[in-house]
A protein has these predicted regions:
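Bacterial Sec-dependent N-terminal signal peptides
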Residues: 1-26
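Targeting-peptide/extracellular-domain and disordered-appendage signature
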Residues: 2, 24-94, 99-133
Length: 133
């Protein structure tokens, strides 16, 4: 009887250890978060985005339809941070963080800086009045 208890306890310990070990394996994220900061003038510009994975799919024109607003990245909108006031396409842009949305088309893209960071990837609630440019 004592031998059966020892065998059962050993088997239970091995099972518990293997489950714990398996839980520690780190697998790559399907759409990994990326960020970069670059010195610019006397400050920095930073970009934070999740890189979409195509997984064998046609992304533009299929998963992301042409002519529709897109969050410009996976999971949530891409964020761009200007450490100081800048000019973009001749327009003044105040220092701060903005969401980057786009409208991809077959031959060109339209890019928009968006003031409401809480919108994230929910393009259904996109409001033109929150566009900076």
């Amino acid at each position: 009887m004592l031998q059966k208890i020892k065998t059962f306890t050993t088997a239970l310990a091995i099972t518990a250890f293997s489950l714990t070990t398996q839980a520690q394996l780190k697998t790559p994220a399907p759409s990994p978060l990326q960020s970069i900061k670059q010195n610019f003038a006397l400050s920095e510009i930073g970009i934070e985005y999740s890189r979409p994975s195509a997984k064998g799919r046609v992304v533009f024109g299929d998963v992301v339809p042409f002519g529709k607003i897109w969050r410009t990245g996976a999971n949530s909108a891409t964020k761009i941070t200007f450490g100081e006031d800048v000019k973009v396409e001749g327009q003044n842009v105040a220092a701060g963080t903005y969401a980057l949305y786009s409208i991809p088309n077959k031959d060109n893209w339209e890019l928009m800086l968006y003031k409401d960071l809480a919108l994230g990837g929910n393009t259904g609630e996109y409001k033109k009045e929150n566009e900076l440019m």
